[in-house]
Amino acid sequence: SENWKTITAAFIDESYLIGYLTTEEYYHFIGNLRGISKAEINSWVQTFEPFFNGEILGQKKYLRDFSKGNQKKAGIVGSLIGNPEVVLLDEPFANLDPTTQIRLKSLIKLEAEKNGTTFLISSHDLTHVTEVCDRIVLLEKGKMIQDIETTSKTLKELEQYFSN
């Protein structure tokens, strides 16, 4: 079935971006694919200005000319266009400055709470995932070796597991 395509989105890395577009053009392109007007996209994307911190919108720059961190910010927000039920993010905290990492954690929590979005996050950053995830699945050589519900003790348990 092709039904999963309408409820799923992903941002894996900058290769998911269309480098010869500006951020606004990229968002309009995704919006068009999802049946959302330019006006709706323009209004919606303004809600992410605190996350963008003045570095993304209105820059008149091509996506390929942004830093890796700013490309990541643009791509993550692009993956949220149309309020998908499931969003896959690969190493979303990499290449982001500490302030943006904190903002991203808040953004993920807010989207999950407000829209019921499920985030599947692939990450090597134990601290961030224990702060934003309800469940953590450990994979080794493609096999699930642990499925953990996140508690206040999860970070310590993971640190102990990986130090052995």
Where are these regions (language model features)?
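Helical segment within the ABC ATPase nucleotide-binding domain
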Residues: 102-114
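Catalytic Walker B motif of ABC-type/P-loop ATPase nucleotide-binding domains
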Residues: 87-91
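Conserved signature/switch motifs of ABC ATPase nucleotide-binding domains
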Residues: 78, 82
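Helix N-cap at the start of a conserved alpha-helix in ABC-type nucleotide-binding domains
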Residues: 98-100
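Conserved ABC ATPase signature
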Residues: 62-66
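H-loop/switch region of ABC-family ATPase nucleotide-binding domains
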Residues: 122-124
